[in-house]
């Protein structure tokens, strides 16, 4: 509003024109979909998918070790999360496999399996992979035949040149060839080349809509509710001093000045907001809970879990049952994607190193399966394993694997035999002493 200023020199009062400014309203954004997608991703591939395989000979065992080595060198453990996250939020993702010249991979592999290369031509190619998705700037064009089999795959993307300019590139991959074009003044075809794999080196996952589309209305309403509530707090939360009566004068120093009020009903009090906004709290909690419940996503936070107490593994299984059911549904696409990846790598290793793996790649059977994330209760697992082994239901080997020590099964079995032999020897020595 306009302000009046008294000029002591002229003895006149001037009025300064009011200046108006635009005050921005609160706009609170809530990354609800991002949190749900991250939790779903962690439950789906937070625990590495299992690989079930029983090699029938040494060649198949070497091939299985080679598949695991390819997974490790390509950091598939982390790429799985990128694939699932892109599939849930971006609707589609593709994984492209190619070869590079790198003989160090095979040197490390032969050293690990403690054997020497037995072929005539030592392999020099290494399998590499790259992820394509819309948020990474890729436009994906899968091509399927009438039976639903993908027979070709195309990708459009931008490539930055040395002068910071960008050109559009297009590539098409078939079961044998890779074709590329650059769009500068017109489409210029680059020299096509063969990828050298017996199968199409592209894995593709698609879903018809983003995973969190059904909860978008909850998030929009929640953001509007909290934004309006924030504006309400800014205008009404901080108390105002209400003065009732006639102002007779001021007392005290400037800093601690007091107002003297007179007249009937003279009073001074703060205006405070005494009403508790229960309706706002109720709607916010309801919308948030509905968003997580509709997406079968558990709310993993301190506030949510602090009332659980000392929960056992069984209690956590019931708590995460909805998330595990969602993982089973994800397996329709992601499980198939992972299985096709394993099958492709097996065939690719057979083509890269035919001397060692050509025959084994045609006979080996590797099955992969999603393992939903679970907070393991070690005490429950050990108790179950001990009961099953002592009851004759499981072998000692199976009990060790169930208890979570699968990486050291042979070592543990050998140590158990040694300890048992030592105990039997001690018992025999005591028996001889007692007899004498």
What is the predicted function of each stretch?
Residues 59-63, 72-80, 87, 214, ...:
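Short amphipathic alpha-helical segments
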Residues 81-84, 88-89, 94-207:
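Extended, regular secondary-structure scaffolds
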Residues 64-66, 266-269, 320:
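A short, surface-exposed helix-loop junction/capping segment
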Residues 1-127, 436:
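Extended, helix-rich architectural segments
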Residues 11, 19-36, 42, 58-62, ...:
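Alpha-helix boundary/N-cap detector
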Residues 21, 46, 51, 55, ...:
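Conserved aromatic-histidine-acidic binding/catalytic patches
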Residues 247, 256, 261-264, 279, ...:
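C-terminal helix-loop subdomains that flank or include functional centers
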Residues 186-315:
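Extended, charged amphipathic alpha-helical segments
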């Amino acid at each position: 509003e306009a302000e009046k200023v008294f000029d002591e020199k002229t003895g006149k009062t001037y009025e300064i024109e009011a200046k108006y400014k635009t005050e921005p309203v609160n706009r609170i954004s809530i990354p609800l979909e991002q949190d749900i997608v991250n939790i779903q991703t962690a439950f789906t591939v937070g625990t590495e998918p299992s690989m079930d395989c029983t090699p029938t000979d040494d060649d198949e065992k070497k091939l299985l070790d080679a598949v695991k080595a390819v997974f490790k060198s390509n950091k598939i453990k982390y790429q799985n999360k990128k694939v699932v996250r892109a599939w849930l939020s971006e609707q589609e993702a593709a994984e492209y496999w190619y070869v590079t010249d790198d003989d160090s991979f095979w040197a490390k592999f032969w050293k690990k399996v403690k054997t020497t290369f037995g072929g005539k031509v030592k392999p020099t190619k290494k399998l590499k992979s790259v992820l394509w998705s819309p948020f990474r700037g890729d436009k994906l064009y899968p091509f399927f035949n009438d039976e639903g089999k993908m027979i070709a795959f195309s990708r459009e993307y931008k490539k930055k040149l040395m002068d910071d300019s960008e050109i559009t590139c297009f590539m098409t991959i078939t079961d044998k060839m890779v074709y590329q074009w650059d769009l500068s003044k017109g489409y210029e075809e680059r020299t096509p080349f063969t990828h050298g794999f017996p199968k199409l080196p592209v894995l593709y996952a698609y879903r018809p809509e983003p995973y969190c589309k059904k909860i978008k209305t909850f998030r929009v309403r929640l953001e509007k509710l909290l934004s309006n509530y924030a504006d309400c707090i800014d205008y009404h939360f901080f108390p105002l001093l209400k003065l009732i009566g006639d102002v007779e004068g001021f007392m005290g120093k400037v800093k601690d000045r007091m107002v003297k009020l007179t007249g009937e009903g003279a009073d001074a009090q703060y205006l405070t907001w005494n009403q508790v906004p229960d309706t706002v709290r109720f709607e916010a909690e309801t919308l948030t809970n509905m968003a997580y419940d509709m997406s079968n996503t558990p709310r993993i936070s301190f506030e949510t879990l602090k009332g659980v107490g000392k929960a056992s593994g069984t209690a956590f299984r019931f708590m995460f049952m909805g998330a595990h059911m969602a993982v089973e549904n994800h397996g329709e696409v992601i499980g198939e994607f992972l299985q096709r990846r394993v099958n492709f790598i097996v065939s690719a290793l057979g083509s890269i190193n035919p001397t060692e793996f050509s025959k084994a790649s045609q006979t080996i059977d590797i099955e992969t399966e999603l393992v939903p994330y679970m907070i393991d209760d070690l005490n429950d697992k050990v108790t179950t394993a001990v009961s099953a082994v002592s009851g004759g239901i499981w072998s000692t080997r199976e009990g060790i694997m169930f208890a979570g020590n699968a990486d050291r099964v042979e070592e543990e079995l050998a140590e158990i035999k040694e300890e048992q032999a030592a105990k039997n020897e001690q018992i025999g020595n005591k028996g001889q002493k007692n007899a004498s």
